[in-house]
Amino acid sequence: MTEALHIVCPHCHTTNRVAAEHLASAPDCGKCHQPLFTGHPLALDAASFERHIGRSQVPVLVDFWAPWCGPCRMMAPAFEHAAGLLEPQVRLAKVNTEDEQQLAARFNIRSIPTLALFVNGREVARQAGAFRSAQDIVGWVRSHL
């Protein structure tokens, strides 16, 4: 029997069931017919955060950042590139801590950027401070999976 994973659509936020062996074949959402993986980080607000973290069975790496943060801006291209390298095994997302202050407080974000890796809805790893390259991000994620 084939294992089916729950994957939340980055466009309409519908939860989809996808056979694990079909992850690499660019599956589309059953509702909106858009790609389930875009190769780019998702911008999450509080509602979409709950849906993606709580319902997705694919690990989610979240970058808690702020627009005024120099190290956040420095790491942004590496994080973008890492999304293309890690999907579909890991979804990458960003939370603007200026816009989502309650979410940042809930996760006790004290310095930015902070990366948090969630697996099956639970935080399994955290890194405060910027990574210099996409390869550093990928290596850190893989070391925690």
Short names for language-model regions:
Residues V18-P27:
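Short linker/helix segments within small regulatory modules
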Residues Q57, F64-W68, S111:
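Short pre-active-site segment immediately N-terminal to redox-active cysteine/selenocysteine motifs
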Residues L44, F64, A76-A83, E87-Q102, ...:
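Thiol-based oxidoreductase modules, predominantly thioredoxin-like and allied folds used
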Residues T15, P41-V60:
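A short beta-strand-turn-helix
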